[in-house]
């Protein structure tokens, strides 16, 4: 009663309200922490605005009565939606008037009387402590009214009450328009739109990334296929290589020739600039050896001999080899002749030796005969000595002739 006096409510009680008051006290044994809101006429002048209460997975309505009270319906537990609640206009006014009862929110008393709360008042007393209600705060000891909130003007409260009463059947009241604040009490507005748009933005970003990655893969495949087709290996035939060498020589050598100019001179549809460039590099490294001159110090190119030069070199080397073989044969012949001359000389020497041996044997016989025939005349002895001397001279003359002939032959060779 003190809180009602603080808010300026009158203490006069109507007959119907007093009868309901006595019946409730008898039924619930006069609860000590119960709170009674009185004065029907005063509340008609200063009605309390009714609003929807939502929090988490529960929801409920605040129903107005004919006397201007706001009846707090139960917040549906276990995830019951607002659509399961009946509209405001479907409840009769007589029933709303009969349900203008004190706000009692003590959970311990509800637990002690589970069977007595089966009637429609059970939903009224099963009010959640976690649900925020404007100008009302539920506590374990009861429901207290926040005295710091200022009340609106009487005309605004009266208009809101009239609008709540005049709601048609089958349609729900627009609480955001009636209360003028859709951000704080609209359950749909508790979740800001940017948070709702975040998954959509993520999905669109992922789709864009997938599209970009697929496009990159397609472009990479196309570029790789184009490079592969442009850089296919080509077999250089001897005829094509000869044409390449002629084109390089026409352009002034491998250092001055460019792949583009060589490609124009070749005029082969199967060739590309990559083929000509690689072949030109190989031609430079294989066919030319850079050398530095002693005077200028600039690199000089020494061209390899062509096929004709190689053939001429082969002919020259073969001629030289044949000449060397001929000389070797001649030397061998001369050596063979010398061997024959030496053999003939050796035979002559042996012959002369045998002849001398015969002469010595004859002389020995003559001496023996002299000793045996001491009586022989000196003329016979002188004749024998003269024969021996003549034989020796002939032998020496023959030897000298053979030696001089062999010397002449050696000199001629």
Curated annotation (Swiss-Prot):
Residues 181-191, 208-231, 369-383, 396-405 have a biased composition (Polar residues). Residues 228-288 form the HTH myb-type domain. Residues 171-196, 208-233, 363-413 are annotated as: Disordered. Its main location: nucleus. A motif (LHEQLE) lies at residues 335-340. PROSITE patterns: HTH_MYB (PS51294). Disruption phenotype: No effect on phosphate starvation responsiveness, due to the redundancy with PHR1. One of its GO terms (cellular component) is nucleus. PANTHER family: HTH MYB-TYPE DOMAIN-CONTAINING PROTEIN (PTHR31499:SF80), MYB FAMILY TRANSCRIPTION FACTOR PHL11 (PTHR31499). This is Protein PHR1-LIKE 1.
